[in-house]
Amino acid sequence: RSVHPSITYWCSGVTKSKISTFRQVFYDKGLKDDWFLNNFKIAHRSQGWIFSHAGMVNRQIPYGMTVDQVIDEVLPDVWLNFRNITYRQNPLISAVGIARGGEDNVGGLLWLDYYNEFNASPDIGKQVFGHSYVPEPTATALNTEYESWNLDTNLKDYAIIRDGRLTTYKIR
């Protein structure tokens, strides 16, 4: 979508109405709230899985760091500075890859393109994400220690994780 008259990025399902609502909730209201700032996470771990908006890949991880270090140490700082217009946006979350109309080598955690940039990896581990529309929940590296699921089915499906095992269900 257009963020400036001369800049266009592609993000499935984005409409002017959704952008307006997002802006109002997350910027005009939500991000001014200390609780929201202190508790919102760009990536979250639970039951052996990583949850993020668009997914994580090896190329996003700074050299010499582990995924755990990025989630626990780097992302909280990046998030706290996300709205600071004097702070250069960190490509870990804000990079827009060529597949989405950007100029970065790979998209960040908010912009990674599933079809052209994502690959499951034992270095990252199990994960759940969306951002790139798929008609049905789609698994990569199923039944491995780096099983990854894209659940962006336009609100048609959800998943439950029990004992580390992910199962998808249709929303009725």
What do the predicted segments below correspond to?
Residues 1-3, 57-59, 117-119, 128-140, ...:
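Active-site environment of divalent metal-dependent phosphoester hydrolases
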Residues 1-87:
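Active-site neighborhood of divalent metal-dependent phosphoester bond hydrolases
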Residues 9, 85, 98, 166-169:
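Hydrophobic transmembrane signal anchors and adjacent membrane-proximal interface regions, especially
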Residues 37-39, 127, 146:
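Short beta-strand-initiation
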Residues 45, 118-124, 142-144:
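Flexible, charged surface loops at secondary-structure boundaries
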Residues 51-53, 126-132, 150-153:
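Active-site neighborhood of phospho(di)ester-bond hydrolases with catalytic His/Asp-centered motifs
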Residues 76-136:
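Alpha/beta-hydrolase fold catalytic core
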Residues 136-172:
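Binuclear metal-dependent phosphoesterase catalytic core
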